[in-house]
Amino acid sequence: MALPERFRPAVSPLSDPGQVLVGPTWRITILTERLLRLEWSDDGQFEDRATQVVWNRDFPPVPFELTRDGDGLHLTTRGLQLAWDGRRFSPGGLQVRQPGVRDWRSVWHFGDAETVQEREPGWHVGNLGGTARTLDEAEGAVPVEKGLLSAFGYATLDDAASLALDEDGWPTPRVGDVDLYLFVHGHDAPAALRDFHALTGPAPLLPRWALGNWWSRYHAYSADEYLALMDRFEHEGLPFSVAVLDMDWHWVDIDPRHGSGWTGYSWNTTLVPDPEALLADLHGRGLKVSLNLHPADGVRSFEDAYAALAERLGLDPADGDPIPFDVADPAFMEAYFDEVLHPLEEQGLDFWWVDWQQGGSSSIPGLDPLWLLNHLHFLDSGRDGRRPITFSRYAGPGSHRYPVGFSGDTVTTWSSLHFQPWFTATAANIGYGWWSHDIGGHMFGERDDEMVARWFQLGTWSPINRLHSTSSPFQGKEPWNFGGPAASVMADALRLRHRLIPWLYTMNERAHRLSEPIARPVHHLDPRPETLLSGSGAFLFGTGLLVAPLTTPAERRTRRASVTTWLPEGTWHDWYSGLRYTGGRFVTLRRPLETYPVLARSGTIVPLVDGDDLSVANPEALLVRVFAGADGEFVLYEDDDAAQPASCTTRFAWHQDEGVFTIAPVVGDASAIPARRRYRVSVTGLAPSDTTSAEGTTSYDPATGTVTVDLGEVAASEGASFGFAPAPTASDQRIDERIFAIVHDLQVGYIDKHQLCAFLESTPSTLARIAGLESLPIAQDIKDVVLEVLLAGAE
């Protein structure tokens, strides 16, 4: 049957004939200088349709040289050299080399095993990993699938098991025996991702509201209880943009003759007497709403939509027979969306949480139901001019087209927290950029306020920040349920996440346009053994930021947790304290509970919401953070959040030598942003300056070395600029003051404190302090926390 247009993705699967070499049973397509398609078909049939993974093979022509050698050939582009003996593909007969690379391991042979490296650094390195379907019930590390990068510079994407998409966009059996895409990008991760997204489709532009804080909990909320919770969040000044209702929104305690209550499509009107009123109230608070779906048990006679669905499918509703859930039947799926899901959306639902946990088999051989559910839900959600979104588990390469990812129900332990940053960043190696995790852990484990606070801090600096937990009354993630400083740390993490939305939304647009996932392994910027082998979990976050998550408890005496990571070349500023670090080395970062290791490279510019605005709208006021020491620019992207957005950009630029900051006039359709906007600009890493060419007020924070200029209101169409006179110099690191604060905080004997301070006071030279510290008769962890600051001061 013909599917509605909304279920037919735009594809362009035919390659330029001039880029295709073909024989009776083989075909080689030069897609880019570093991407080849290699096919073998015993019956001479080759797949020209789009597949579940690959949607586009229509690449611009690239130059190549071809030399025939009997039945074989030699093919050369600027990025690779292929040699083939003309026989059935084999390890000895088909090889690809990387020009200029001498390591024998960099030569790809057909059939080479591409094992994923071990989780921790080790002598064996292969493929650098991609991601996994789920973290359900995981406590710590899980195996991940292959990605597009390896230590040896090549990786393959095997598309032979993919189903083809017919003219209606429906999955169908394919032809051909071997269908392999060979990525030969060396360690150029950005180029590999650009080619991959050109081949499979770009990452979509997420709605702006998806980048705020999500509230979710497996709990049988009544409407009154849920709204009271939202009232409490507002009273506490805790901003949320998404409200997720887990499965208790529908009837779960059903007549046993119908089976399990796991699947449901009808509101539990005992808990929610007026669903439309609840949804309208949540919308009035600026929240988007998602409902949980476990669709595997089909639609049964007690459901509100049963009669309409039965009649649509030609069944007699009076029979009362369950209607099986058949994801492989296009007639059923079209009716399912139209008769079951759309009426709920018309009540005010914004998007679905597709919680499929019933395996990978269907009535179409080779079809994983999860993939088709993700595919159809995402496409359906974009109808009527809406920006599409779904929320589900990963279903293999190409799943980046269906954000947001749901990683599943993890165990609440430090080992789970330790694995998540690495897992999130490594997913970028397969172009998958929008994982959301159960921040704080989902189930089991044990209560540890420090651990949950650190998880919240990680959530701030994650692609998606979604709080979630099981139904246990002891595992809710409301910050006020946690004791001591943890509660305020958690609240501050949520507030900072919300303030980052303008910057995050620009990163969202970059991910869509430039194939640059927001969270990426450090080797994407600085590929070297120290980063390719790194097991620290540190990752790049957007443009110019590096996050080094704290995933182990604090040391008792120092009250600080620590992490060691490679820091790429350049000068890096601590986001919270302003302390500067010199890169090109390993650094160990130690932080008390109140702060987190987030470093900004000199020249980085980050715009944030200024003030206490809890909405996700394009803000009336911005605080623009600038990290001095190098020139930098940032182009802020804003739009109206439509599927075909009216968008505009505002360019911020910092000129280090001149000490000038510029806000350029807006470019594009500015109808979605304020005509006038209040600006404050904070430049970190500068000595105080008494003079500025800006109109407005200037203040200085000596603790962080930050000059803040309040520009007042600036017309978007005009922009503004200011400069410092004389030209700015770097701020004093205030090393002694920082060390005194650390020593004051140490949980050790006072004699040790005095001894340490006396040594520092009598030794003014930084190098002498570093050398002499080791000889002091105090514990090593105390020396280490002081050494971090001394090394930073030795720049």
Q: At which residue positions do the language-model features occur?
A:
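Catalytic and substrate-binding clefts that recognize carbohydrates or anionic sugar/phosphate headgroups
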Residues: 66-208, 217-218, 223-224, 230-235, ...
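Accessory, solvent-exposed terminal regions and/or long lumenal/extracellular loops of proteins
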Residues: 602-697, 711-716, 721-795
